[in-house]
Amino acid sequence: MARTKPTPPPLPHALIPLPAHTLPILRTGPQAVAYHIPTSPSSPSNPILKTTIALPLHSTWTSGLHFHTRHTEYLRLVQGAVHVHLDGEDKILSASTGGEIDLRTGALKAEGLVVKVPAYARHEWRRAEAWYAGRRSVGAKMTRPEDVGDEVVVEEYTDPSDLEKPLFFWNLNGIITATEDGELSVLQRVVRFVLGGWWIPFQLLVVFWELDNWPVFWDLRGIMRQFLGLKPWVYRHFGWRLEYAMTFVVLFAAKILGWWTGVRAVEQRRTPDKLWEAYKRHGI
């Protein structure tokens, strides 16, 4: 019996040329990703702050299921093919095809490579390749787009176009990629010891609360439909309220603990100078 070749590891790299007014952060591993994050506030020459995310072949990175309360978000596909889950609906967008494709035939279903995500809409996106891999056992025949194996490049931006998105990505990645903690107070060292492996997730929750990124911890829409067999109206009337309540309670608890211990969502050591100066002057 022939052996299946192991899947090569995804290799992230910075885009060449770099998107204007950005610097890259690379994260390796199975969820390899390259973030190109704005380093300065908006200006007449750069009115919309765009974070460009590149996902190499075989990356299993996902944005995670989440929502925003203060912003409308836009996802613009530049290259490759992505799966977008938006308020219970699954979409595959292909840059080479020019828009959303039919999941069964692969034909163009709707032109356009920009996905609008309204405030409070639950959404998640990833490489289409990763989504198809998870659907193999379902049995439904699906036609994949030609560019499913290409590197994925997506621009994220918001309306209003303020500092929150770049501050979020700089501080999120600053926490995740830090090789060691910055200078900690005695209280922070005690909390870090007590939390153990939850120290980093706790800091991320503080960032989520402050910078308008609300994770959905339990996908009750899927649980109610697939495992409990409940009708869709149950989620429409009750499920989403439970999801939002759980998210609020968890993040609020983290915010209170962060306030008590002095753990902040935005810190100077994780933030480029021009963004930090704008944040100190005007807030988010």
Place the predicted regions along the sequence by residue.
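Jelly-roll (double-stranded beta-helix
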Residues: 2-72, 76-78, 83-284
